[in-house]
Amino acid sequence: KLINQVVLIDYTIIILGGYCMYNENYSIIFSSMTGNTRKLADKIHEILPKESCDYFGTADAQGIKSELLYIGFWTDKGNADSDTLDFLSKLKNKKIFLFGTAGFGGSNAYFQKILGNVKMSIDSSNTIVGEYMCQGKMPQSVRERYVKMKESPKHPDNIDALIENFDKALSHPDADDMEQLKNMII
Protein backbone atom coordinates (compact mmCIF):
# COMPACT_ATOMS: atom_id res chain seq x y z
CA LYS A 1 0.00 0.00 0.00
CA LEU A 2 1.30 3.44 -0.84
CA ILE A 3 2.11 5.81 1.99
CA ASN A 4 1.59 9.54 2.08
CA GLN A 5 2.68 9.95 5.67
CA VAL A 6 4.77 7.99 8.14
CA VAL A 7 3.96 7.82 11.84
CA LEU A 8 6.71 6.47 14.07
CA ILE A 9 5.48 4.25 16.86
CA ASP A 10 7.53 1.75 18.88
CA TYR A 11 8.94 -0.22 15.97
CA THR A 12 11.20 0.36 13.04
CA ILE A 13 9.67 1.54 9.81
CA ILE A 14 11.49 1.10 6.53
CA ILE A 15 10.19 2.97 3.52
CA LEU A 16 11.08 1.58 0.13
CA GLY A 17 9.72 2.74 -3.19
CA GLY A 18 6.55 4.14 -1.61
CA TYR A 19 5.90 0.98 0.38
CA CYS A 20 6.21 0.58 4.11
CA MET A 21 7.65 -2.56 5.61
CA TYR A 22 7.50 -2.98 9.37
CA ASN A 23 10.56 -5.06 10.19
CA GLU A 24 9.76 -7.12 7.12
CA ASN A 25 12.04 -10.04 6.38
CA TYR A 26 13.74 -10.05 3.02
CA SER A 27 16.04 -12.07 0.80
CA ILE A 28 18.78 -10.84 -1.54
CA ILE A 29 19.11 -13.06 -4.59
CA PHE A 30 21.59 -12.24 -7.33
CA SER A 31 23.52 -13.46 -10.34
CA SER A 32 26.91 -11.89 -11.02
CA MET A 33 29.25 -12.94 -13.80
CA THR A 34 31.98 -10.31 -13.24
CA GLY A 35 31.35 -9.35 -9.61
CA ASN A 36 29.56 -6.07 -10.39
CA THR A 37 26.08 -7.17 -9.34
CA ARG A 38 27.57 -8.90 -6.29
CA LYS A 39 28.92 -5.49 -5.19
CA LEU A 40 25.40 -4.05 -5.36
CA ALA A 41 24.02 -7.05 -3.44
CA ASP A 42 26.68 -6.58 -0.76
CA LYS A 43 25.76 -2.89 -0.46
CA ILE A 44 22.06 -3.70 -0.03
CA HIS A 45 22.97 -6.31 2.60
CA GLU A 46 25.14 -3.73 4.38
CA ILE A 47 22.30 -1.17 4.46
CA LEU A 48 19.39 -3.35 5.59
CA PRO A 49 18.97 -4.93 9.05
CA LYS A 50 20.93 -8.21 9.07
CA GLU A 51 18.51 -9.86 11.49
CA SER A 52 15.71 -9.48 8.91
CA CYS A 53 17.65 -11.21 6.12
CA ASP A 54 16.29 -14.70 5.40
CA TYR A 55 18.67 -15.48 2.54
CA PHE A 56 21.65 -13.97 0.71
CA GLY A 57 22.99 -15.68 -2.38
CA THR A 58 22.28 -17.02 -5.83
CA ALA A 59 18.84 -18.16 -7.00
CA ASP A 60 17.67 -20.89 -4.66
CA ALA A 61 14.32 -22.13 -3.38
CA GLN A 62 15.29 -20.95 0.12
CA GLY A 63 15.37 -17.36 -1.16
CA ILE A 64 11.71 -17.30 -2.09
CA LYS A 65 10.33 -17.76 1.42
CA SER A 66 10.54 -14.00 2.07
CA GLU A 67 7.76 -11.74 0.84
CA LEU A 68 10.27 -9.02 -0.09
CA LEU A 69 12.95 -10.03 -2.58
CA TYR A 70 15.89 -7.94 -3.77
CA ILE A 71 16.78 -9.55 -7.08
CA GLY A 72 20.00 -8.66 -8.88
CA PHE A 73 21.11 -9.51 -12.39
CA TRP A 74 23.77 -8.85 -14.97
CA THR A 75 22.71 -7.75 -18.43
CA ASP A 76 22.88 -10.16 -21.33
CA LYS A 77 21.78 -8.86 -24.73
CA GLY A 78 19.47 -6.19 -23.30
CA ASN A 79 17.82 -8.37 -20.67
CA ALA A 80 18.65 -10.07 -17.38
CA ASP A 81 20.81 -13.18 -17.51
CA SER A 82 18.94 -16.44 -18.15
CA ASP A 83 19.27 -17.75 -14.56
CA THR A 84 17.61 -14.62 -13.19
CA LEU A 85 14.86 -14.65 -15.83
CA ASP A 86 14.12 -18.28 -15.00
CA PHE A 87 13.98 -17.48 -11.28
CA LEU A 88 11.76 -14.42 -11.80
CA SER A 89 9.30 -16.37 -13.94
CA LYS A 90 8.56 -18.72 -11.01
CA LEU A 91 7.69 -16.02 -8.46
CA LYS A 92 4.13 -15.33 -7.33
CA ASN A 93 2.74 -12.72 -4.92
CA LYS A 94 6.10 -11.20 -3.97
CA LYS A 95 7.37 -7.66 -3.51
CA ILE A 96 10.39 -7.29 -5.77
CA PHE A 97 13.18 -4.73 -5.84
CA LEU A 98 15.17 -5.21 -9.06
CA PHE A 99 18.81 -4.21 -9.31
CA GLY A 100 21.32 -4.81 -12.03
CA THR A 101 24.42 -3.82 -13.92
CA ALA A 102 25.14 -3.36 -17.61
CA GLY A 103 28.41 -2.83 -19.44
CA PHE A 104 26.94 -0.04 -21.52
CA GLY A 105 26.24 3.00 -19.39
CA GLY A 106 25.50 6.67 -19.54
CA SER A 107 21.94 6.23 -20.75
CA ASN A 108 19.02 6.03 -18.37
CA ALA A 109 16.83 5.21 -21.38
CA TYR A 110 18.94 2.09 -21.99
CA PHE A 111 18.63 1.04 -18.35
CA GLN A 112 14.85 1.56 -18.50
CA LYS A 113 14.65 -0.56 -21.64
CA ILE A 114 16.51 -3.37 -19.88
CA LEU A 115 14.27 -3.12 -16.81
CA GLY A 116 11.22 -3.18 -19.09
CA ASN A 117 12.49 -6.38 -20.70
CA VAL A 118 13.16 -7.94 -17.29
CA LYS A 119 9.68 -7.04 -16.01
CA MET A 120 8.13 -8.96 -18.91
CA SER A 121 9.30 -12.16 -17.15
CA ILE A 122 7.59 -11.24 -13.87
CA ASP A 123 4.10 -12.55 -13.12
CA SER A 124 1.48 -9.83 -12.61
CA SER A 125 0.73 -11.13 -9.09
CA ASN A 126 4.07 -9.65 -8.00
CA THR A 127 4.66 -5.99 -7.14
CA ILE A 128 7.78 -4.10 -8.21
CA VAL A 129 8.62 -1.90 -5.20
CA GLY A 130 11.83 -0.42 -6.59
CA GLU A 131 14.54 -0.72 -9.18
CA TYR A 132 18.12 0.37 -9.71
CA MET A 133 20.67 -0.08 -12.47
CA CYS A 134 24.17 1.18 -13.05
CA GLN A 135 27.10 0.57 -15.33
CA GLY A 136 29.49 -2.26 -14.56
CA LYS A 137 32.95 -3.07 -15.79
CA MET A 138 33.29 -5.71 -18.50
CA PRO A 139 35.88 -8.45 -18.96
CA GLN A 140 39.11 -7.35 -20.70
CA SER A 141 38.30 -9.81 -23.50
CA VAL A 142 35.50 -7.47 -24.61
CA ARG A 143 37.95 -4.61 -25.17
CA GLU A 144 40.34 -6.94 -26.99
CA ARG A 145 37.49 -7.99 -29.27
CA TYR A 146 36.65 -4.32 -29.98
CA VAL A 147 40.28 -3.51 -30.81
CA LYS A 148 40.46 -6.50 -33.13
CA MET A 149 37.21 -5.42 -34.81
CA LYS A 150 38.63 -1.92 -35.32
CA GLU A 151 41.52 -3.39 -37.33
CA SER A 152 39.04 -4.67 -39.90
CA PRO A 153 38.11 -2.27 -42.73
CA LYS A 154 34.48 -3.29 -42.22
CA HIS A 155 34.35 -2.40 -38.51
CA PRO A 156 31.18 -0.87 -37.05
CA ASP A 157 30.93 2.91 -37.32
CA ASN A 158 30.60 3.20 -33.54
CA ILE A 159 33.67 1.10 -32.67
CA ASP A 160 35.51 4.06 -31.09
CA ALA A 161 32.46 4.78 -28.92
CA LEU A 162 32.37 1.13 -27.83
CA ILE A 163 36.04 1.25 -26.80
CA GLU A 164 35.49 4.57 -25.00
CA ASN A 165 32.47 3.12 -23.15
CA PHE A 166 34.52 0.08 -22.13
CA ASP A 167 37.22 2.33 -20.66
CA LYS A 168 34.64 4.44 -18.78
CA ALA A 169 33.06 1.31 -17.35
CA LEU A 170 36.29 0.14 -15.69
CA SER A 171 35.59 2.00 -12.44
CA HIS A 172 31.95 0.90 -12.10
CA PRO A 173 30.10 0.30 -9.94
CA ASP A 174 31.81 3.22 -8.21
CA ALA A 175 31.16 5.20 -5.01
CA ASP A 176 28.54 7.37 -6.73
CA ASP A 177 26.70 4.27 -7.96
CA MET A 178 26.70 2.86 -4.42
CA GLU A 179 25.43 6.13 -2.96
CA GLN A 180 22.59 6.24 -5.49
CA LEU A 181 21.68 2.65 -4.63
CA LYS A 182 21.73 3.49 -0.92
CA ASN A 183 19.39 6.41 -1.55
CA MET A 184 16.98 4.07 -3.34
CA ILE A 185 17.01 1.66 -0.41
CA ILE A 186 16.68 4.06 2.54
Annotate each language-model stretch with its function.
Residues 3, 10-11, 28, 71, ...:
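Exposed boundary/loop context
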Residues 22-47:
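N-terminal beta1-alpha1 ligand-phosphate binding loop
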Residues 1-20:
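Short, Lys/Arg-enriched N-terminal segments with co-localized hydrophobic residues
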Residues 7, 13-14, 39, 63, ...:
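Low-complexity, compositionally biased segments
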Residues 54-65:
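Short acidic low-complexity segments
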Residues 22-25, 47-52, 66-71, 76-186:
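FMN-binding flavodoxin-like domain, especially the glycine-rich phosphate-binding loop
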